[in-house]
């Protein structure tokens, strides 16, 4: 495996791990809908504490899905779509591979059915 493919694989892994948690998915939805938002504002919309929101945002940040920008005493978080785009490309390639395999199986099955007549 090349270093570039390994790097993409690690990026996809961290994104999928981050997205595995429903609270983190909710945070991404809120950030996508509202733009830059503080952890305090996000916590007001979720059934978790501000501290829990900050921990979830740290996981999302480590995966490259969000970024924080300090404005005075606050940190405002926003979605960073690049990591999600890379994951979507990986998933699309995986889906295309499975589509090709299923088409091959269908072709073999149809040929076997024709030959049995």
Language model feature labels by segment:
Residues 44, 61-62, 67:
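Alpha-helical residues within the helix-turn-helix
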Residues 107-117:
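Short, charged, intrinsically disordered terminal tails
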Residues 1-3, 116-117:
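Short, intrinsically disordered, low-complexity terminal/loop segments
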């Amino acid at each position: 495996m090349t270093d570039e493919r390994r790097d993409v694989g690690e990026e996809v892994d961290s994104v999928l791990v981050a997205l595995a948690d429903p609270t983190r998915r909710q945070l991404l939805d809120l950030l996508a809908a509202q733009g830059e938002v503080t952890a305090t504002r996000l916590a007001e919309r979720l059934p978790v504490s501000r501290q829990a929101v900050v921990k979830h945002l740290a996981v999302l940040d480590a995966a490259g899905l969000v970024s924080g920008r300090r404005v005075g005493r606050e940190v405002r978080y926003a979605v960073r779509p690049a990591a999600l785009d890379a994951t979507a490309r990986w998933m699309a390639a995986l889906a295309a591979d499975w589509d090709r395999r299923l088409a091959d199986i269908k072709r073999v099955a149809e040929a076997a059915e024709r030959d049995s007549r």
